[in-house]
Amino acid sequence: ACLVGSEMCIRDRYQALYRKWRPKVFSEVVGQEHITDTLRRQVAEGHTAHAYLFTGTRGTGKTTCARILAKAVNCLSPVDGEPCGRCEACRAVDAGTTLDITELDAASNNGVDQVRALREEAVYTPAVLKKRVYIIDEVHMLSTPAFNALLKILEEPPEHLMFILATTELHKVPATILS
């Protein structure tokens, strides 16, 4: 129910705990130090890959690390591989207002048409950020034709492109994608 007067509705002030407390930089991620140290070092040295595959059980930080990596590679003032959180790029990523970072939930968008559309869009250079990043969550849910369509862009990606795939079921990801 809404309060009387100029007070906000309680529902307008509610924020899910996972959103409020989700790590924003690698150093805030708990229990994945070996992974976050590697990612931070790659960003700091400018030696990031064009594709990553994050795997693990639910709640281990795959999507969170993917979002931090996407922010870090686009940060205008990174500090030892960590995103600064203050530059225009970091603020846009945190607010979810940039078109250059796309998250796709493969559990609900698992068809070849969605991946073909992604592939057609991916060839364009980023509108604002340094890199265009696609985070595909639950990638194991893609159909076989969708995996085949994804493979084409993974094999020869443009320089400005990065894919971060996340899965809880690595055994369902085709070997051609894993290589």
Where are these regions (language model features)?
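P-loop/Walker A NTP-binding region and its immediately flanking N-terminal helices
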Residues: 6, 11-179
